[in-house]
UniProtKB/Swiss-Prot annotation:
Lineage: Bacteria, Pseudomonadati, Pseudomonadota, Gammaproteobacteria, Enterobacterales
UniProt keyword Cell inner membrane present: no
The organism of origin for this protein: Cronobacter sakazakii (strain ATCC BAA-894) (Enterobacter sakazakii)
Function: This protein binds to the 23S rRNA, and is important in its secondary structure. It is located near the subunit interface in the base of the L7/L12 stalk, and near the tRNA binding site of the peptidyltransferase center.
Stated name of the protein: Large ribosomal subunit protein uL6
A GO term, aspect molecular function: rRNA binding
Assembly and interaction partners: Part of the 50S ribosomal subunit.
InterPro entries documented for this protein: Ribosomal_uL6-like, Ribosomal_uL6-like_a/b-dom_sf, Ribosomal_uL6_a/b-dom, Ribosomal_uL6_bac-type, Ribosomal_uL6_CS
């Protein structure tokens, strides 16, 4: 059995938490995040900490409480420090550029690919082959990174494509004659 839910989430100074039934809003220097929690979870806010437990009558109460604790901990980290995700473009002529809140990608297609960034996500290009995504919402950062990677996933023979900075692409050997 996981004991994730038994640990409280400590709320640092400068973070404001509002609990309205099952809807929780966390506000900090990097923005404001809102999430609706499962009905099986009971959240208590006291002494600059959030504690979690199951409600009576729900079989999966502890599992849902552990999930809620992990999600809210990520929200607190997001509004205080924020999250970053780095992408690399590997391939001849593969380039990225940022214009406002649009990521412009040249990925070997006959046309450039423009990807509109959602609100709350910022992107920068330290070089033409790198993209750094920043934001407070961990799930949204991962989704945007996955969307950008999906335009040209790393292929298994040369490794060309869009990859996460920490991703290891396994390459295959070419067919022998």
């Amino acid at each position: 059995m996981s004991r994730v839910a038994k640990a409280p989430v400590v709320i640092p100074a400068g973070v404001d938490v509002k609990l309205n039934g099952q809807v929780i809003t966390i506000k900090g220097k990097n923005g404001e995040l809102t999430r609706t929690l499962n009905d099986a979870v009971e959240v208590k806010h006291a002494d600059n900490a959030l504690t979690f437990g199951p409600r009576d009558g729900y079989a999966d109460g502890w599992a849902q409480a552990g999930t809620a604790r992990a999600l809210l901990n990520s929200m607190v980290i997001g509004v205080t420090e924020g999250f970053t995700k780095k992408l690399q473009l590997v391939g001849v002529g593969y380039r990225a550029a940022i214009k406002g809140n649009v990521v412009n990608l040249s990925l070997g297609f006959s046309h450039p690919v423009d990807h509109q960034l959602p609100a709350g996500i910022t992107a920068e290009c330290p070089s033409q082959t790198e993209i750094v995504l920043k934001g407070a919402d961990k799930q949204l950062i991962g989704q945007v990174a996955a969307d950008l990677r999906a335009y040209r996933r790393p292929e298994p023979y040369k490794g060309k494509g869009v990859r996460y900075a920490d991703e290891v692409v396994r390459t295959k050997e070419a067919k022998k004659k």
